[in-house]
């Protein structure tokens, strides 16, 4: 059963299979073709990004939750190699902007997603420890550090939220009396997508996020058939439920809540629906700009694997 409200069976089948083909093609090209090595770290990071998109894409299609965890090993391999090679390519400022939760909203959310997936899927300890090495940022966030600490004893907990909008609501749910947690969790999930559409910042500093909304926020609003859309899943809520034992019954069936991640053997939490192929409400040009920022619809030249491209059709 398709879990996403958007996209029919043909859409999800096409793009799940296309991604699998591209993964193999990218691995083959990395082994055989030489290119500008300065692009290789970003290219490898985009490969890692492709794996976490595929995890969520398969969830959206309705695949068995047990099939999702197999993407962690190649994801970690690609990300680790990107970081290794990037040390000689990225400047200190670039390294900071790529990794700092407070500055990089995209990185914060992706780390939250991967932690949530890792907890829900109970990945092995060796993979978990590799993931934590890549995530870093220990002691930087009052919420995500606590979630990670549910499986990493002794982790330093931050004293502030890197991104109060929308994550203050989730922290309130975590801190609430148990009888209030479920309702507050639902409030977070119900406002999560809208509140990530944040106003632009007038100036930048070390404490100011580079972008006002996540790179994927408008995926599907334009050129839905192009394949960038992989779902809009609040994995952060699943992470908190797994870490703190919050009652998620009010969230089950919400179009943004991936509750089946916590119930791999069923029953399913998503209602049957008439899937749309999805016209959206994004302003003209905004979705295209977000896609360019993420690299997901930029084709990689067949003779240059080191270009910072991605895997989907133009």
Question: How should these model regions be labeled?
Answer:
Residues 183-298:
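Alpha-helical oligomerization segments
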Residues 139, 279, 292, 306-307:
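N-terminal functional modules and adjacent low-complexity/disordered segments of proteins
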Residues 119, 242-245, 310:
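Charged/polar positions within long, soluble alpha-helices
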Residues 2-220, 229:
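Eukaryote-skewed repeat-based solenoidal scaffolds used as protein-protein interaction platforms
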Residues 16, 160, 237, 304-305:
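Short linear sequence motifs
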Residues 294, 301-305, 309-311:
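Intrinsically disordered, low-complexity segments enriched in serine/proline and basic residues
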